[in-house]
Amino acid sequence: MRAPQHNSDFSRTVDQLADDPNPYEPEIGSMPQNDLTRADLDNVNKTGTTTIGISTADGVVIATDMRASLGGRFVSNKNVQKVEQIHPTGALTLVGSVGGAQSFISSLRAEVNLYESRRGEQMSIDALATLAGNFARGGPFFAIHPILGGVDEEGSHVYSIDPAGGVMEDDYTVTGSGMQLAYGHLEQAYEEDMSNEEAVSVAAHGIKSAVERDTGSGNGVFLCEITDEGVDIHGHHDFDEVL
């Protein structure tokens, strides 16, 4: 295949495209960078994890376990909060490498704040999900698979965001190493138009089911309740406190 001639219209277009910014970059600044290789991921802290998101008649309920592991062989932390508020009425879970997930959350939170300060209104949850998918696809956030939940004028929303940037909305979803165990419970217990109180019990039972058999999940449950009034997050090492 012949190379384009120097200074031809085509070569100048190629040079211009090479200098264009990444379409997935944030509005201000640039995407966080790292030089991790795939092999390095075997030796970083990971959340392992089971995370659950349920859309309800009142809003959204998110539940996660509390365990982080090192290399999948050692429990490095027993009290990890794996769900963080990133929007006045929205929250995101940490799934995968801890550093990548934390950087992902910080980047999204900054974009949400910037949007509100520039436009004088809150970003919709659907727009936030699209932004999260773009960041996951175009950024350096290795091995993340979070759940985004939130409430806006259109109602309550739950999305799973895969490592390639795929965004899927559903009534309920589960991600992480214990997802198969938790899904078994949710398939039986989920009902349409549940209240947040009912969904808390269903989600906590789902996390408990995963903790029983999944070595990457354990040590308790964090529960996040989202309504149009805000986000409330609380943790429990003893499942009996919420079941």
Curated annotation (Swiss-Prot):
Catalytic center residues: T49
Cysteine-cysteine disulfides: none
UniProt EC number: 3.4.25.1
Statement: the UniProt record of this protein carries the keyword Coiled coil: no
Activity regulation, per record: The formation of the proteasomal ATPase PAN-20S proteasome complex, via the docking of the C-termini of PAN into the intersubunit pockets in the alpha-rings, triggers opening of the gate for substrate entry. Interconversion between the open-gate and close-gate conformations leads to a dynamic regulation of the 20S proteasome proteolysis activity.
Pfam families, A to Z: Proteasome
Taxonomy, superkingdom: Archaea
Record localization: Cytoplasm
The reaction(s) this protein catalyses: Cleavage of peptide bonds with very broad specificity
Keyword terms: Autocatalytic cleavage, Cytoplasm, Hydrolase, Protease, Proteasome, Threonine protease, Zymogen
Propeptide: 1-48
Residue segments, region Disordered: 1-34
Annotated family: Belongs to the peptidase T1B family.
Subunit structure: The 20S proteasome core is composed of 14 alpha and 14 beta subunits that assemble into four stacked heptameric rings, resulting in a barrel-shaped structure. The two inner rings, each composed of seven catalytic beta subunits, are sandwiched by two outer rings, each composed of seven alpha subunits. The catalytic chamber with the active sites is on the inside of the barrel. Has a gated structure, the ends of the cylinder being occluded by the N-termini of the alpha-subunits. Is capped at one or both ends by the proteasome regulatory ATPase, PAN.
HAMAP family: Proteasome_B_A
PANTHER family associated with the record: ATP-DEPENDENT PROTEASE SUBUNIT HSLV, METALLOPROTEASE TLDD
Its biological purpose: Component of the proteasome core, a large protease complex with broad specificity involved in protein degradation.
Protein name from the UniProt record: Proteasome subunit beta 1
Top-level taxonomy: Archaea, Methanobacteriati, Methanobacteriota, Stenosarchaea group, Halobacteria
